[in-house]
């Protein structure tokens, strides 16, 4: 995704036009810069994408990466001034940043899940972006925008 400095950012998706506010563009640039520094494929996912398609304002964004989400959150936090606290949940491989204006940013590593026949609790292990998307239900959670393309 080519991120440019402007009052808003427009991304063209086949048959769709998605517009980002100046604040959203700034956040996306910082996450994209951190992902590039770490060399991890990263996608904006879920409700944020839905809200942008519908032309709604947002107050949070979720990202999935093909790698260490906690490391990506830590690298992203360094892009802000002041540097926000990174809350992480090592058991789940997730992290959270709240920037100074109250905007929440969540990070999760791509994963795949498998189930034993007698259990509803998944066995979780790191996976590819494709495996992560395949495990999601076919609703809002499966929407994604690449930060690299």
Feature roles, as predicted:
Residues 5, 11-149:
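Catalytic cores of the polymerase beta-like nucleotidyltransferase superfamily
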């Amino acid at each position: 995704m080519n991120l440019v400095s402007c009052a808003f950012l427009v991304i063209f998706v086949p048959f769709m036009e998605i517009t980002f506010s100046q604040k959203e563009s700034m956040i996306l640039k910082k996450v994209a810069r951190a992902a590039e520094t770490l060399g991890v494929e990263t996608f904006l996912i879920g409700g944020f994408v839905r809200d942008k398609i519908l032309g709604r304002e947002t107050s949070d964004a979720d990202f999935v990466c093909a790698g260490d989400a906690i490391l990506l959150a830590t690298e992203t936090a360094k892009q802000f001034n002041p540097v926000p606290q990174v809350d992480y949940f090592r058991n789940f491989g997730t992290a959270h940043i709240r920037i100074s204006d109250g905007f929440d940013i969540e990070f999760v590593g791509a994963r795949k899940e498998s189930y034993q026949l007698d259990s509803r609790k998944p066995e979780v292990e790191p996976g590819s972006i494709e495996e992560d998307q395949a495990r999601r239900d076919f609703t809002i959670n499966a929407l994604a925008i690449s930060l690299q393309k």
